[in-house]
């Protein structure tokens, strides 16, 4: 994904928390080694993306847009929207999309700038691949791990990576904090 132009300032980023204007889009690498901007995916800080190869669909998380959108790559139309604060990364596994969301404000994140381990709440949300409707939500208070950035389900566990700590964590898919 192309989140924003290289000359995008911190002031513009903070303004976009409220304005939610288009800052970037998903980019496709073609067979001719060229990049094609998918303008129909334009949104506020497109971040995590995942390709559902079986259905030829693309999921794009809009970090400051507070939503994830499922696009049909053939028709270039939206098939579903999941609205939730600050989606980060997305994984497709087991016939579902797994979207990690930051369940805290940008102001709370800014207070973590100097700390090694920033403990703020987040969730990993299991979504339908047909329309991004919520199937199940796993919520974490992040007491000792750091802010979750990605959740990968595997063998009854949810493996969680963090963007503001030096840890990964394993959570039981049958329990939530």
Each predicted region: which residue ranges?
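Loop/turn-rich, solvent-exposed surfaces of beta-rich toroidal or solenoidal domains
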Residues: 52, 84-142
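Blade-level signature of beta-propeller repeat domains, shared across WD40, Kelch, NHL, RCC1
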Residues: 147-177
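Beta-rich, blade/repeat-based domains predominating
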Residues: 20-25, 35-57, 65-66, 81-96, ...
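Short loop/turn segments that connect beta-strands within beta-propeller blades
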Residues: 29-33, 72-76, 128-132, 174-175
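Structural signal for beta-propeller blades
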Residues: 24-26, 66-68, 106-107, 124, ...
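Beta-propeller blade signature
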Residues: 17-31, 117-130
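Short, conserved, GDST-rich strand-edge loop motifs in beta-rich repeat architectures
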Residues: 1-21, 100-119, 170
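Residue position within the beta-strands of beta-propeller blades
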Residues: 1, 60, 99-100, 160-161
């Amino acid at each position: 994904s192309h989140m924003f132009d290289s000359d995008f300032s911190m002031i513009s980023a903070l303004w976009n928390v409220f304005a939610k204007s288009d800052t970037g889009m998903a980019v496709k690498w073609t067979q001719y080694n060229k990049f094609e901007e998918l303008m129909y995916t334009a949104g506020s800080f497109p971040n995590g993306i995942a390709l559902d190869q079986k259905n030829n669909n693309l999921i794009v998380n809009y970090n400051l847009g507070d939503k994830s959108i499922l696009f049909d790559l053939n028709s270039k139309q939206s098939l579903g929207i999941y609205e939730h604060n600050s989606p980060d990364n997305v994984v497709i596994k087991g016939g579902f999309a797994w979207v990690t969301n930051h369940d805290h404000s940008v102001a709370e994140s800014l207070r973590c700038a100097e700390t090694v381990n920033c403990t703020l709440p987040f969730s990993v949300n299991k979504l339908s691949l047909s329309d991004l409707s919520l199937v199940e939500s796993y919520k974490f208070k992040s007491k000792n791990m750091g802010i979750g950035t990605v959740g990968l389900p595997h063998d009854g566990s949810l493996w969680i990576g963090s963007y503001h700590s030096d840890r990964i964590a394993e959570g039981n898919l049958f329990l939530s904090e």
